[in-house]
Every structure is written in C-alpha cells, then in structure tokens.
UniProtKB/Swiss-Prot annotation:
The keyword Cell membrane applies. It holds the Pfam family LGT. This is Phosphatidylglycerol--prolipoprotein diacylglyceryl transferase. Keywords: Cell inner membrane, Cell membrane, Membrane, Transferase, Transmembrane, Transmembrane helix. PANTHER family: PHOSPHATIDYLGLYCEROL--PROLIPOPROTEIN DIACYLGLYCERYL TRANSFERASE, PROLIPOPROTEIN DIACYLGLYCERYL TRANSFERASE. InterPro entries: Lgt. One of its GO terms (biological process) is lipoprotein biosynthetic process. Pathway: Protein modification; lipoprotein biosynthesis (diacylglyceryl transfer). It comes from Shewanella sp. (strain ANA-3). It is an enzyme of class 2 (transferase). A 1,2-diacyl-sn-glycero-3-phospho-(1'-sn-glycerol) binds at residue 149. It is a multi-pass membrane protein. The chain crosses the membrane at residues 27-47, 66-86, 104-124, 130-150, 181-201, 208-228, 242-262.
Length: 268
C-alpha cells in the first residue's frame, strides 16, 4: 500500500500584503528557500572553521568573498543552465522566460558551471590556484545539495517513476500512481553520503585537485543511479531510449573526476 505525501504547506509564513506604488505585494518565506538558507549558513560555518584551522592560508574575510560569489554563481548558473539544458525551446520562443524566476527551475549542472566561474574569479583575485579554491569548497557543497532536495520534497516536485516498492508515495502533482520518493534518495546520496565520503577522503589525501575530483566522481555516480528511478523531464524524455539529460551531463563529471584523482602527483 502506497504512502500518502505529507502535504506540507510550502509557505512557512506570509508577510503583508503591502501596497507599493499601486502594486500589491505579499512576500513569503517558503520552505524551499529556507532549506537553501539553512544549507548556506551550515556551509559558511564549516568553511569558517576550515579557515580557522588553515594556519593562515585562509581568512574569514576571504571565505566571505568566496561565499558571496559562489552564491551568485549558483543562482545565475543554475537558472541559465535550467533554461538551456531543459527548456531551450521555451527560451527560443520567448527569451524573457530566462527571467521568470517565480515559475521556478534550477539546474545543478548549470549551478556547478556558475560556481566554477566564481572559483576562477576568486582564484585570480586571491592569487591562488583554481584547485586550491575548489578543494576548499567541494566538501561543503553536499550540504546545500541535500538541503535543496528536502525543499524539492516539501514542494512535492521532482518525484520518481511509478513503482510498487513498499515505501512508494502518491504525490499530488504526480497523478494517482505511487512513485519513488526520489528527492529523498538524492538527499541521502548527494547530500549525506557524499558529504561523509568527501569528509573522509579529504582527511586522507593532500593531492591538489583530488578532493574536487572525488566530488565530481561521487556526485556523478550518485546522480546516474538516482536518475534510473527519477521521472524524466516530460519535455525531454529519454535519449536513445535509456538515458536522461541528468545522466548525460553527469558522465563528463565522472570521467574528469577520475582523471583528477588518478593523475600523477604534481601534474597541474
């Protein structure tokens, strides 16, 4: 027998309404945004802790700089990636779709590209190597990923494929069929398991770029696994009859992650 979705109100609290220049606004604090905020604060705390233990290699001010540009990279890259990877036809028909943030839509792979761009800038600004920055950031990224998947679950979105497993769940927007709660699988793998893996691995290697490589490898493998039970995007379906867009975008991550881990010591 399928479990019922808990139907948590996605809005925690509403403010207003407010009248500003004849326009009515009713801002709200939503669980989706709140989970990301919690993830951001937790990541900031851990990065500051790492900075305090870095023997002067990092300061808290430099961490704040990194977080600011990293956050911009996630938001801008995530939105642009979502539109280009998953709704390119909408964008061609109406370029303003890119700015319709209120309709939702973020892509991890786009966000990753945005963060990489931010890290390149920080490396240049702080006169570091790129992987010195990336290895600092990689272990805390799963915190934000896990928090975001909890937000997806509360929103009742990005559910899995139809199944008859005992823990299958009926989602309000997923029809009457029981489905995999794939958001929770992603929370467990991309959030908890990946965080523990990176924490363990970062204590056992000093090789520049290896921690970044393990993040790419671990995330890529976990994403490929979960995509086998996650409902493919309706507008894209399956490529070649068996691969989702998420899996296609994860394959280069896996290959490059392996390269970073296995490349000879000292090779930049």
């Amino acid at each position: 027998m399928a479990l019922n979705f808990p139907n948590i109100d996605p809005v925690i609290v509403k403010f207003g309404p407010f009248d500003i220049f004849g326009q009515t606004f009713e801002p709200a604090l939503r669980w989706y945004g709140f989970t990301y905020l919690v993830g951001f604060v937790a990541a900031m705390w851990l990065l500051n802790r790492q900075a305090d233990r870095s023997n002067g290699l990092w300061s808290r001010e430099q961490v704040s700089d990194l977080l600011f540009y990293g956050f911009l990279g996630v938001i801008l890259g995530g939105r642009i990636g979502y539109v280009l990877f998953y709704h390119f036809d909408y964008f061609l028909a109406s370029p303003m779709y890119l700015f319709k943030i209120s309709e939702g839509g973020m892509s991890f792979h786009g966000g990753l590209m945005g963060v990489i761009t931010a890290m390149i800038y920080i490396a240049w600004k702080q006169k570091r190597t790129f992987f010195a920055v990336a290895d600092m950031v990689a272990p805390v990224v799963p915190i934000g990923l896990g928090a975001g998947r909890i937000g997806n679950f509360i929103n009742g979105e990005l559910w899995g494929r139809v199944t008859d497993v005992p823990w299958a769940m009926v989602f309000p927007s997923g029809g009457p069929e029981p489905r995999h709660p794939s958001q929770l699988y992603q929370f467990a793998l991309e959030g908890v398991a990946l965080f523990l893996l990176l924490y363990w691995f970062s204590k056992r290697t000093k090789k520049v770029g290896a921690v970044s490589g393990m993040f790419l490898l671990g995330y890529g493998i976990f994403r490929v696994i979960v995509e086998t039970v996650r409902q493919p995007d309706a507008q894209l379906g399956l490529y070649w009859g068996f691969m989702t867009m998420g899996q296609i975008l994860s394959v280069p991550m896996i290959l490059f992650g392996l390269y970073l881990i296995l490349r000879p010591e000292g090779k930049q």
